[in-house]
Design a protein with these regions (language model features):
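Flexible glycine/acidic-rich beta-alpha junction loops that bind and position SAM and/or redox cofactors
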Residues: 159, 194-195, 215-240, 258-282, ...
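Structural preference for beta-strand elements that scaffold enzyme active sites
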Residues: 146-148, 184-186, 217-219, 263-265, ...
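Conserved PDZ fold ligand-binding element
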Residues: 17-37
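Conserved Radical SAM active-site core
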Residues: 61, 68-214, 224-251
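Radical SAM enzyme core and accessory elements
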Residues: 1, 7, 275-446
């Protein structure tokens, strides 16, 4: 473990961090004598009211004493959430998205993490194949819950093959052990036709249902293949998607009868592949896997339903743009076209919907989250775009700043010669059209 601690990147005025004497550039080494390896340790050991912070400032090591109010926020930000580095993935899944990336994309995309701390902090999925006994002791002490686990299959030999061939622990025993520690799990199964579909998928769901005291949800996600993946892998077809939904519906009915939750949650993409409508809001049980593409479309439709009623009641809704272009990936294109037509009717402005194909990963990749800046420039560069173009928020990183191929929003605005905004919902679109400060980026932005 690194002894360098966490680099302080920001200190909020009037916060505990400022009161304790922390400064930007300090390194927090320990709290009450406990070395800190990450922000998880900071939260855990920093939960006491009386704290002694061991800090490196330049060449000096200082002890800072301060009292922290009950539930008072630290008010100090760290340069990175993990102070001792990210634990990388040692598996070799044939469908691994990162392994199939071409060169020239945003550097952070090539990090193949498999770190349970990031799973706890940000909901990233982990395989649990690299847990050591020291990790289990920490999990027992700190109760890091929930964790997000890539199961793929519960049958040990099949899971071993799906993860690349090396021996792996029995995921059923690992989940059972997590449950005994009071840690809950949100699981995902990436469906790879010919491997873990059919009877294998049925067995996986059955095994996870038997562990339902620990497993809170199971997302079913179709394998995402690009032109850079091995040819032996097959995509989920509409027919298979329908079969998966039929099986999932049966389990969802059983789970609701016995546990008052649906337990199994097919992703939006599976519904779209099968040509079926996504189910109602209540069936998502609070949207536990929305970041995994489960329920985004339902949220979109619900938001527009509410917003449409509001706009129709307020026919004088103020918008500053008379013409707008809405951009989408292929999968969401029918819904964005519907939105464009209804917005135009209600607001009395020109609204154009443009579907952007994926040139980098191939036309079979239909989600907006994998569109690149280059895709946008090639699809939009020769078109009349109106006063503002609204892009899918999922095209950009967590900070909303960069595309997969490292284009920024100001760079795209300058290249396309028009004002740009991003939106994750119909409400965001109306906000961008309102002309509010900061809602969009002009073409002459720095």
């Amino acid at each position: 473990m690194s002894t360098e601690g966490g680099l302080i990147a920001s200190v909020a005025a009037g916060s505990f961090a400022e009161r304790a004497g922390l400064r930007c550039g300090d390194r927090l080494l320990a709290i009450n004598g406990h070395p800190v390896r990450d922000v998880v340790d900071v939260r855990f050991y920093g939960s006491e009211e009386e704290l002694v912070l061991t800090v490196r400032r330049g060449a000096a090591v200082l002890s800072l004493r301060a009292s922290r109010g009950y539930c008072e926020d630290w008010g100090g930000g760290f340069a990175e959430p993990l102070f001792d580095g990210v634990r990388s993935c040692a598996n070799h899944c044939p469908f691994c998205f990162v392994a199939g990336l071409p060169a020239g994309l945003r550097p952070s995309l090539y990090v193949r993490d498999d770190d349970y701390r990031l799973s706890f902090l940000s909901g990233s999925f982990v395989t649990l194949t690299n847990l050591e006994e020291s990790d289990w002791k920490r999990l027992a002490e700190q109760r890091l819950s929930p964790l997000y686990v890539s199961v793929q299959a519960t049958e040990p030999d099949l899971r071993r093959r799906l993860l690349g061939g090396a021996p792996v622990p029995d995921i059923r025993e690992q989940i059972r052990r997590l449950g005994e520690l009071g840690i809950t799990v949100h699981a995902q199964v990436v469906i790879c036709p010919g491997f873990n579909d059919g009877a294998a998928l049925e067995q996986t769901v059955s095994d996870l249902w038997a562990l339902r005291s620990a497993v809170r949800s199971v997302a079913l996600v179709p394998v995402g293949l690009t032109r850079h993946h091995p040819a032996r892998l097959r995509r989920v077809t509409p027919g298979l998607a329908w079969e998966v939904l039929t099986m999932a519906d049966r389990w969802r009915r059983l789970a609701y009868r016995e546990a008052r939750r649906r337990f199994v949650y097919p992703s939006d993409e599976i519904y779209l592949l099968a040509g079926r409508q996504v189910p109602g809001t209540a069936t998502y049980d609070g949207f536990p896997q929305i970041a995994n593409g489960v329920g985004l479309l339902r949220r979109f439709l619900d938001d527009w339903s509410r917003l449409r009623r509001h706009l129709m009641q307020r026919s004088g809704q103020h918008v500053t743009a008379g013409s707008v272009t809405l951009v989408s990936g292929t999968a969401m294109s029918p819904y964005v076209r519907m939105l464009a037509q209804e917005l135009a009717q209600i607001l009395g402005i020109s609204v154009t919907a443009i579907e952007v194909p994926n040139c980098l990963f191939g036309p079979e990749v239909t989600v907006a989250g994998l569109l690149t800046g280059r895709d946008l420039v090639e699809a939009l560069g020769h078109r009349e775009l109106g006063e503002i173009v609204i892009l899918p928020r999922t095209m950009f990183d967590a900070a909303g700043e960069r595309t997969l191929d490292d284009w920024t929003l100001p760079e795209l605005a300058r290249t396309l010669g028009t004002r740009l905004a991003t939106a994750a919902s119909p409400s965001d679109i109306i906000h961008a059209l309102s002309g509010a400060d900061g809602a969009s980026v002009p073409p002459d932005s720095a």
